[in-house]
């Protein structure tokens, strides 16, 4: 217990420090073309970005435009800050194409369909704690990185399944996104997008999902490896949808377990988010799957969601973003309340042997 508390103190301290260990710049770096070029070279070194000579000059111009956006935004009186992260020499169009949804070829894959029975197990919850953080409760694994693969849906799904499994078994097990990318192909499309609800159903029907160590992530689609996926580690009993456009209902769900959600993550402020409570410009054009792992309120009274992303630990607040909660629009900020869903696990039981499908027996 003491060790867990110490670990959380260390994590909390690093969250307070925010961008202390990340790439930073100063006004003197903006003084001349030469100093800007030096800044770009330092940024490339920090993020180990390799560019050919011809490409470097083109990317330098993109970098300068992004730098000025970050610089000018940070001078404004906003409750969040931006930074020059690993996306700093990508145009917003390029960023959106790779990380925020242009690979979701069919919008219905994120919009989904209503659950037939409309069940919501937390409907009768009457009170919730003022704040919840499933990281503190040991229900969240280390931040992961989807790379240049549109597999955010798989990462969102896995966060929720890892969370409910820890809640039911008191054991935190890192699960395999790659299994979903390679094998869940009936409705989902690997690196070209997918829907968390369909992934929950895949895991239920298959009888479980294997571990990350057994089937590690490769940031690209491959052939489904039956020898790995049959080694089941964690099972679920299904999933439910949170009532759409209802942040109060979403709060009840998150108070009890991590929840998968879809958002619009394609804006420039989201691209370069660093710290604080994000209130930035965004739409309800859902293009990115993430997971809510808690909520809270700042000292000035701003309510927020704690959202786990899949762009690595250097993005945002060590891989997380706090997004404003309880806004006037029913859809929530960036559409966060439009399509929430979560896995159901009724007991602490998990698979004890390999799964064998009819195809395996032929």
From Swiss-Prot:
<keyword id="KW-0788">Thiol protease</keyword>
<keyword id="KW-0378">Hydrolase</keyword>
<feature type="disulfide bond">
    <location>
        <begin position="282"/>
        <end position="334"/>
    </location>
</feature>
<dbReference type="InterPro" id="IPR013201">
    <property type="entry name" value="Prot_inhib_I29"/>
</dbReference>
<feature type="glycosylation site" description="N-linked (GlcNAc...) asparagine">
    <location>
        <position position="346"/>
    </location>
</feature>
<feature type="glycosylation site" description="N-linked (GlcNAc...) asparagine">
    <location>
        <position position="326"/>
    </location>
</feature>
<keyword id="KW-0732">Signal</keyword>
<feature type="active site">
    <location>
        <position position="152"/>
    </location>
</feature>
<comment type="similarity">
    <text>Belongs to the peptidase C1 family.</text>
</comment>
<keyword id="KW-0865">Zymogen</keyword>
<feature type="disulfide bond">
    <location>
        <begin position="149"/>
        <end position="191"/>
    </location>
</feature>
<comment type="subunit">
    <text>Monomer.</text>
</comment>
<comment type="function">
    <text>Thought to be involved in the hydrolysis of stored seed proteins.</text>
</comment>
<keyword id="KW-0325">Glycoprotein</keyword>
<dbReference type="GO" id="GO:0006508">
    <property type="term" value="P:proteolysis"/>
</dbReference>
<dbReference type="InterPro" id="IPR025661">
    <property type="entry name" value="Pept_asp_AS"/>
</dbReference>
<dbReference type="InterPro" id="IPR039417">
    <property type="entry name" value="Peptidase_C1A_papain-like"/>
</dbReference>
<feature type="signal peptide">
    <location>
        <begin position="1"/>
        <end position="20"/>
    </location>
</feature>
<protein>
    <recommendedName>
        <fullName>Vignain</fullName>
        <ecNumber>3.4.22.-</ecNumber>
    </recommendedName>
</protein>
<dbReference type="GO" id="GO:0005788">
    <property type="term" value="C:endoplasmic reticulum lumen"/>
</dbReference>
<dbReference type="InterPro" id="IPR025660">
    <property type="entry name" value="Pept_his_AS"/>
</dbReference>
<keyword id="KW-1015">Disulfide bond</keyword>
<feature type="propeptide" description="Activation peptide">
    <location>
        <begin position="21"/>
        <end position="131"/>
    </location>
</feature>
<feature type="short sequence motif" description="Prevents secretion from ER">
    <location>
        <begin position="359"/>
        <end position="362"/>
    </location>
</feature>
<dbReference type="Pfam" id="PF00112">
    <property type="entry name" value="Peptidase_C1"/>
</dbReference>
<keyword id="KW-0645">Protease</keyword>
<dbReference type="Pfam" id="PF08246">
    <property type="entry name" value="Inhibitor_I29"/>
</dbReference>
<dbReference type="InterPro" id="IPR000668">
    <property type="entry name" value="Peptidase_C1A_C"/>
</dbReference>
<dbReference type="InterPro" id="IPR000169">
    <property type="entry name" value="Pept_cys_AS"/>
</dbReference>
<feature type="disulfide bond">
    <location>
        <begin position="183"/>
        <end position="224"/>
    </location>
</feature>
<feature type="active site">
    <location>
        <position position="309"/>
    </location>
</feature>
<dbReference type="InterPro" id="IPR013128">
    <property type="entry name" value="Peptidase_C1A"/>
</dbReference>
<keyword id="KW-0256">Endoplasmic reticulum</keyword>
<dbReference type="GO" id="GO:0008234">
    <property type="term" value="F:cysteine-type peptidase activity"/>
</dbReference>
<feature type="active site">
    <location>
        <position position="288"/>
    </location>
</feature>
<dbReference type="InterPro" id="IPR038765">
    <property type="entry name" value="Papain-like_cys_pep_sf"/>
</dbReference>
């Amino acid at each position: 217990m003491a060790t867990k508390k110490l670990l959380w103190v260390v994590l909390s301290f690093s969250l307070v420090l925010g961008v202390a260990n990340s790439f930073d710049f100063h006004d003197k770096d903006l003084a001349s073309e030469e100093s800007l070029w030096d800044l770009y070279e330092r940024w490339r070194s920090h993020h180990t970005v390799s560019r050919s000579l011809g490409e470097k000059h083109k990317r330098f111009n993109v970098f300068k435009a992004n730098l000025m956006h970050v610089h000018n935004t940070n001078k404004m009186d906003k409750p969040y800050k931006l930074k020059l992260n690993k996306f700093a020499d990508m145009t917003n169009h390029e960023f959106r194409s790779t990380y925020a949804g242009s690979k979701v070829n069919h919008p219905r894959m994120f919009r989904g369909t209503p659950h037939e029975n409309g069940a919501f197990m937390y409907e009768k919850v009457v009170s919730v704690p003022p704040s919840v953080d499933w990281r503190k409760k040991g229900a969240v694994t280390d931040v992961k990185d989807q790379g240049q693969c549109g597999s955010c849906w798989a990462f969102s799904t896995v966060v929720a399944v890892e969370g409910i499994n820890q809640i039911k078994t008191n054991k935190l097990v890192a699960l395999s996104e790659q299994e979903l990318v390679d094998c869940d192909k009936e409705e989902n499309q690997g690196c070209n997008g997918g829907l968390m609800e369909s992934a929950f159903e895949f895991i239920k029907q298959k009888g479980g999902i294997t571990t990350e160590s057994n089937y590690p992530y490769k940031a690209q689609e491959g052939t489904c490896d039956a020898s790995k996926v049959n080694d089941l580690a964690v099972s679920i009993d299904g999933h439910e949808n949170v009532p759409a456009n209802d942040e109060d209902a979403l709060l009840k769900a998150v108070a009890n377990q991590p929840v998968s959600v879809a958002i619009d993550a394609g804006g420039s402020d989201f691209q370069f988010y660093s710290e604080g409570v994000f209130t930035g410009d965004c739409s309800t054009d859902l293009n990115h799957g993430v997971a809510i792992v808690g909520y809270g309120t700042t000292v000035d009274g701003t309510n927020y969601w704690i959202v786990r992303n899949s762009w690595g630990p250097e993005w945002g607040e060590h891989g997380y973003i706090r997004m404003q909660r309880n806004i006037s629009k029913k859809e929530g900020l960036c559409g966060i309340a439009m399509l929430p869903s979560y896995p159901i696990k009724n007991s602490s039981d998990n698979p004890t042997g390999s799964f064998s499908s009819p195809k395996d027996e032929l």
